[in-house]
Structure formats: C-alpha cells, structure tokens
C-alpha cells in the first residue's frame, strides 16, 4: 500500500505542473501585466511609469515563460511562470497584487469556509441517504413515484433561485436570520443557518436520486433474495445488507469531496458575505489578481488529488477483497 501511495503522489507532480501551466496560459491570454496594473491602480489615464513601477514591485516586469536576457538556468527561473507558479510546490504562495500575504489570508479564511462546508456535508449526507433509503423501501409505490418527481424538480431549479428566494423569504420577509454577514465564535451560528439550509436543499434532488439508484441496484442482487429467503425482514435486509454493500459506490462520491470542503463554496460565500476561501477566489477573479487565482487553483487541485487517493484507500476498508497494487 505504501508503494501505491508513493506512486500516486509521484504521478500527481506532472498533473499539478500541467494544471499550473494551463491556469497561467488561460489567465495571460485574457490579460497582460499592463492590464492588471491599470486595473489595480484604478486610474483611467495612468502613466507608463506608474505601470512599470507596479509591475516591478510585484514581479510582473519579467518575461512570461522564457527570459532571453538571462544566462543558464535564469532563462527559466527568472520568469513570471517560475516565480508565480512553480514556487507553489514549496508552499510559497507569495503576496497578492494588493500586497497582502496570501498564505495568511488562506489560514484566516479557512475557518469560515469549514464552518459552512462541514455542516452542509454532514447534514446533506444524512438527509439524502435517509430519503434514498425511504424511497428504496417504498419502491414501485406512489411515494416512490412522487419522491422521484420531487427530486427531478429540485434538480431542475438553479442554485441562484434557492439563494435569492431563501434570502428574500427567510431574511427580508420573515426576519428570522440575517440576510448576510459573518461573526466569530458562537455568534456565527445565526449567520450560517440560512446558507447551510439552502445548500442542503439545493443538493437534495441529485444526491437522493443517485443514492436511490445505487440502493435499487443492490436490492436486485442474489444475496438480497437469499436474505429474504432466510426470513429476514425488509428493514433488516435494507439496513444490514443493502446499505453496507452500497457503501463502495457511495464512497466514490463522498470521500473525494471531503478535502474540497476546505475550499468552501463560491456562490454561497459570495452571496451571504462569508469571508471564506470561496468568496476570496471570486474576489480575486473579479480583480484579475493572478497571484491569488493560481494559488487557489493549485490548492484545489492538490485537495482533489488527495480526495481521489483517500477514495482508493477507503475501498480497502469497506471491501477486504480490494487490493491496491
């Protein structure tokens, strides 16, 4: 297993380099360092001297990927790509274009992101699995039919509708919770209730429908018919046998998401004014802050690779027949 983990981590290096190169290319196809300087300076008629000063202070006065004027390794190392992207492998995030330390911002904003992502993940998993088991238990009945119809309807509604509608009804009309904002400690609870409920509601349809399909596939297998033939009740068969064997495909979609919880939610954090990593990324994109964008893309890629690795390792815990080679 150790050899497998090491091999997967080595495979991740070229993938991360490719992701960094793709992010770098896409960003600078749309923008140039001069465009970034003019946007950050916020002046319509900015002087060329001010642009050059801004670029020099932030390291954007170098060539993008190849420095002809440098000697030896400097042709590669004294470039924007090397200094802004490859240093991420040493966890050197550098500074944002506004001068703030990106590493400090990530540490500060990780707490609010987890404060909303963890409840959404745990509550959403419990609710969707419970509903899916309920529909599987009452399969081929009116409850199952209308449950599937409700799932499809919920899937068809945009997340923006849930957010805007929830803010209008719960906060503006009923005045139950604040419409947006965030506070530290236990005071954060009143700001998190609405975004957590909305996030769970937005994901119920697709997740419940997927889990229901998995449970129905397991119910049709031979071991379930054998369990029924032994006289076990339908509830016992469903919870003791079907749920256990359905954990392998469920883990595929669940474990891989766990590391990504640190990244927060882009839409929810932005609409509800939560100072997490999701809103931090959106603000950086709007400000064309490449330093922050490439850092967040890199962290997201690393967490996704870690999630895939954890998924493979979790298979061996759920199913002893699985061997990693």
Give the predicted meaning of each segment.
Residues 16-21, 152-163, 253-258:
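Hydrophobic alpha-helical membrane-insertion segments
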Residues 25-34, 87, 149-178, 198-200, ...:
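Membrane-water interface segments at the C-terminal ends of transmembrane alpha-helices
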Residues 9, 50, 54, 77-93, ...:
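Hydrophobic alpha-helical segments of integral membrane proteins
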Residues 63-129:
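An internal, D/E-rich "acidic patch" concept
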Residues 6-16:
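N-terminal signal-anchor/signal peptide hydrophobic helix marking the start
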Residues 2-3, 110-143, 159, 183-325:
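Alpha-helical transmembrane segments of integral membrane proteins
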Residues 16-76, 174-188:
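Hydrophobic alpha-helical transmembrane segments of membrane transport/permease proteins
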Residues 12, 109, 113, 149-152, ...:
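Residue-level signal for discrete positions within transmembrane alpha-helices
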């Amino acid at each position: 297993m150790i050899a497998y983990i090491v091999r997967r981590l080595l495979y991740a290096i070229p993938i991360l380099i490719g992701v960094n190169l793709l992010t770098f290319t896409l960003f600078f196809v749309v923008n140039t360092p001069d465009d970034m300087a003019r946007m950050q300076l916020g002046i319509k008629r900015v002087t060329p001297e001010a642009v050059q000063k801004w670029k020099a202070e932030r390291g954007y006065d170098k060539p993008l990927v190849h420095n002809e004027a440098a000697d030896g390794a400097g042709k590669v190392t004294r470039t924007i790509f090397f200094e802004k992207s490859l240093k991420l492998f040493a966890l050197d995030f550098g500074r944002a274009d506004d001068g703030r330390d990106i590493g400090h911002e990530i540490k500060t904003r990780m707490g609010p992101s987890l404060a909303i992502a963890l409840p959404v993940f745990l509550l959403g998993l419990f609710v969707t699995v419970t509903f899916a088991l309920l529909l599987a238990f009452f399969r081929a009945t009116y409850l199952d039919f209308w449950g599937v119809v409700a799932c499809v309807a919920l899937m068809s509604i945009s997340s923006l509708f849930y957010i805007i509608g929830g803010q209008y009804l719960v906060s503006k009309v009923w005045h139950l919770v604040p419409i947006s904002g965030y506070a530290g400690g236990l005071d954060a609870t009143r700001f998190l209730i609405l975004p957590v409920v909305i996030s769970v509601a937005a994901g119920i349809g697709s997740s419940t429908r997927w889990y229901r399909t998995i449970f129905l596939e397991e119910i049709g297998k031979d071991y379930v018919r054998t369990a029924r033939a032994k006289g076990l009740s339908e509830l016992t068969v469903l919870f003791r046998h079907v749920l256990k064997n359905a954990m392998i495909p469920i883990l595929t979609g669940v474990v891989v998401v766990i590391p990504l919880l640190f990244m927060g939610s882009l839409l929810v954090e932005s609409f509800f004014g939560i100072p997490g990593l999701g809103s931090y990324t959106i603000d950086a994109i709007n400000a064309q802050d490449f330093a922050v964008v490439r850092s967040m893309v890199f962290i997201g890629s690393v967490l996704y690779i870690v999630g895939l690795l954890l998924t493979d390792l979790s298979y061996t815990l759920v199913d002893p027949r699985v061997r990693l080679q």
